[in-house]
């Protein structure tokens, strides 16, 4: 079988980095991009933070109040409201540069993409590394953004590799180095292996990649079911046959609502969410109609309700 070569591009602390590009003076300061809620004040959560802020424990998902507490001694800290229109513009500019290097380009999100470059580089990892560096250089030159790149024979390994030497990293995992590379990882480093899975394995005395590799596939299937068990069996060996699929960027419309007060009353929450969705539908349909007239094609209408209960 001809060797595939897959690149995973991952922009470093993307939202915060975009803000640094817009305002270069922020580069030496702790920067946190915030999702402010409807409650006003410091209610809301951190979307992302630059590495200076991360040194103080500020990370995605942390409440804004907690983040400000961690940075209380840094009077130069910047807490900025998320500007998704600007981030999308920066993403589109970057992705237009990146996709021209691919045989097959798969858009994952504003800050992430897969490229199959197998044919373009004639299945040569050295040539692939040159393309990766070319991508990094051109993106930096035209957008002032840095990105990290992982190169390997499959999507799973490339995604792990892109996060290996952040920020502004480039990591190559050739077929003969897969086993060695996997031994440097923790189980939770594998995409798709979450905390609950790691905990369940730990309960059986399985805490390392090596130990997981020694488990019979049928044991894993009995623990997690056929799909997940098979995935874990393959993933700890660096095996992934999923193809890079042509997927362009999508325009997503979203609206976030935060309750005025925290609640664990499911009847109240259900009623509130249903009323909110009913009120959103006419506006959303109107916006979709306008976008259709501009040439966008509507594929799906999905309502996703996330709950964050704190007891």
Where are these regions (language model features)?
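Long, highly charged, low-complexity intrinsically disordered interaction regions
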Residues: 127-185
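DNA-contacting surface of Y-family translesion DNA polymerases
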Residues: 202-311
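Short acidic, glycine/serine/threonine-rich loops at helix termini
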Residues: 18-20, 44-47, 157-165, 243-248
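Short Gly/Ser/Thr- and Asp/Glu-enriched loop/turn motifs at secondary-structure junctions
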Residues: 108-112, 152-155, 289-293
């Amino acid at each position: 079988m001809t060797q595939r070569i897959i690149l995973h591009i991952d922009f470093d602390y993307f939202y915060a980095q975009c803000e640094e590009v817009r305002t270069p003076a922020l580069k030496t300061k702790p920067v946190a991009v915030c999702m402010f809620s409807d409650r006003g004040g410091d209610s809301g959560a951190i979307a992302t933070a630059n590495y200076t802020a991360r040194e103080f424990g500020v990370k995605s998902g942390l409440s804004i109040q907690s983040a400000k507490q961690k940075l209380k001694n840094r009077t130069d800290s910047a807490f900025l409201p998320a500007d998704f229109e600007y981030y999308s513009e920066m993403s589109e500019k970057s992705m237009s540069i990146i996709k021209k290097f691919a045989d097959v380009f798969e858009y994952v999100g504003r800050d992430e993409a897969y490229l199959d470059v197998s044919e373009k580089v004639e299945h040569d990892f050295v040539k692939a590394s040159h393309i990766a560096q070319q991508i990094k250089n051109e993106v930096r030159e035209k957008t002032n953004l840095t990105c990290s790149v992982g190169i390997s024979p499959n999507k799973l390994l490339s995604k792990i590799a892109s996060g290996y030497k952040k920020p502004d990293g480039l990591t190559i995992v050739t077929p003969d180095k897969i086993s060695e590379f996997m031994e440097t990882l923790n189980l939770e480093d594998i995409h798709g292996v979450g905390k609950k899975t790691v905990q369940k394995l730990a309960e059986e005395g399985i805490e390392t990649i090596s130990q997981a590799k020694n488990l019979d596939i049928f044991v894993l299937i009995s623990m997690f079911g056929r799909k997940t068990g098979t995935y874990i069996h393959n993933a700890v060996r660096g095996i992934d046959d999923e193809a890079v699929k042509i997927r362009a960027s999508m325009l997503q419309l979203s609206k976030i609502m935060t309750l005025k007060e925290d609640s664990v009353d499911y009847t109240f929450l259900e009623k509130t969410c249903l009323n909110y969705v009913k009120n959103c539908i006419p506006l959303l349909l109107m916006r979709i109609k306008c976008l259709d007239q501009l040439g966008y094609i509507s594929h799906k209408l999905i309502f996703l309700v996330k709950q964050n209960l704190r007891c």
